[in-house]
Amino acid sequence: TKKYGYGVPLLGRDWYIGDNIGTDVILTSPANPGEAHDYDENKYAVLHEIVHAYVSVMNPDIDLWLTEGVALYLSNGEPFYKEYLEYVAIPAYKDTTSNNPLTFSNCGGYTFSHTYIEYLDHTYGWDRVLKLISTKNYEECFNKSKKEIYEEWVHYIDNYYQ
C-alpha cells in the first residue's frame, strides 16, 4: 500500500486485509481474499476500516494504539479472556506508544487495544473517549497522565477479567 510500500507482501504478513489512508479505505478483494481470510472476514473488515477513516477525520494524527483500539472495540474485536495472559504478556507502556504497525502487531495490539478503549469507556465514559481521540490530551480528558491511564488499564486487565 501507499502507506507502507510494496514491501508489505514480502514480509509474509498474510493477515493483512485492509487499511485506510485518511478517509480512503483499501481492502483485499472479497473475490480473492488470499489464504488467511475469507469473504465474510472481508465484510467485517469494511466496518473496521470505516471506523479508522472516521477517526482520521476527527484527528489525522491519532496514535495507532487508539485508532486500532477504537476500530476493534466498535467493530470486530475478539472477546478477551484472562487465560490469554498465560500465553501473551500485556504490552509494555513503550509498545502502546509506538506507531509502528509491526510493533503493534507483535506486542499483542490486536489482542489488547480494544480492552484499553473498553476500560476508558466503562471508567470515564464514551464522551471522554471521543475527546481523547480528538485531542490526544490525557491530562485534559482524565486529569491524569498517559502513563497513569496505562497503569490503571493494566490493573483492569489483571483484575477485571475472569
Locate predicted features.
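Active-site-proximal loop and beta-strand segments within enzyme catalytic domains
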Residues: 33-35
